[in-house]
């Protein structure tokens, strides 16, 4: 399976904190990443010329949201894909319920991992909103931020026809719900929802313990931009279901963005549905 192949190319890093473990997958570190017994992560000196890029996944996700991108991006960067606390294999801090509560934990992880140095961050959807809040409260930690289909702008279009699970559903019925929801929210083309994608979605949703999405429907990210000190870029799919009828308003609401690019023929999960076109947009940004 593609997930197993791509994961096998990575280095798996588990960092212990007082609240639990944070889990990274790292690609492109030519001599690997060293980790002390205390969990301190140290980037090998030989990689100093290959700048790190932190990838933050979307809601109900994990590093696998970047499955079709990490190999390409690792050609020029050391890729650090985090399972955000409460998702994937990372632990959920006690009492945490939404993205705003994540900010100090994310700041702790970035500070610990990169010794307080500012790094480039690319965040998809929920991960982009979270990164934007970190950039506002801890501007010294992020050198450049790329937002991909981020919520928190107060621009949600019509309500999506999402379906829920019920206790009596068998495996086949659950997969039908996942297929429906992926088509409704994540993709513009039904043939993008393969059996492997449903497997990926099932595995990610099962590990989502941060179930609240309260602030995603507010304008919290738009409000945060007044405190950004780094360059911020936006990349959206032209057919993003979260922005039906409102996509054209994004650059006005996020007026502090340095650039805003719309990828044609792509849904919300733009970097998965149209990876080549997505790379064509972000590669020049990451060369800066």
Where do the PLM segments sit?
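Catalytic histidine-centered segment of alpha/beta-hydrolase-like enzymes
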Residues: 266-275, 279
């Amino acid at each position: 399976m593609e997930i197993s192949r791509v994961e096998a190319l990575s280095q798996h890093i588990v960092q212990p904190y007082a609240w639990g473990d944070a889990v990274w997958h790292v690609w492109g570190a030519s001599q690997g990443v060293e980790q002390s017994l205390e969990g301190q992560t140290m980037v090998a000196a030989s990689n100093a010329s290959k700048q790190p890029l932190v990838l933050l996944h979307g809601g109900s996700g994990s590093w696998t949201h970047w499955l079709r991108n990490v190999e390409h991006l690792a050609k020029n960067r050391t890729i650090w894909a985090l399972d955000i606390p409460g998702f994937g294999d990372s632990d959920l801090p006690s009492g945490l319920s939404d993205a705003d509560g994540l900010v100090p934990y994310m700041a702790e992880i970035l500070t610990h991992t990169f010794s307080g140095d500012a790094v480039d961050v690319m965040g998809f959807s929920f991960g982009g909103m979270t990164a934007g809040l970190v950039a506002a409260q801890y501007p010294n930690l992020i050198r450049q931020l790329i937002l991909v289909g981020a919520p928190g702008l107060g621009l949600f279009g019509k309500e999506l026809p999402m379906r829920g699970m019920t206790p009596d559903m068998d495996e086949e019925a659950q997969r039908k719900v996942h297929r429906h929801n992926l088509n409704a929210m994540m993709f513009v083309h039904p043939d993008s929802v393969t059996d492997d994608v449903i497997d990926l979605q099932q595995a990610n949703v099962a590990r989502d313990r941060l179930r609240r999405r309260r602030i995603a429907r507010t304008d919290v990210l738009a409000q945060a931009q007044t405190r950004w000190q780094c360059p911020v870029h936006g990349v959206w799919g032209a057919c993003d279901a979260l922005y039906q009828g409102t996509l054209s308003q994004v650059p006005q609401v996020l007026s502090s963005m340095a650039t805003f690019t719309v990828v044609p023929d792509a849904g919300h999960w733009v970097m998965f549905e149209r990876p080549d076109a997505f790379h064509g947009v972000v590669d020049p940004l990451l060369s800066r």
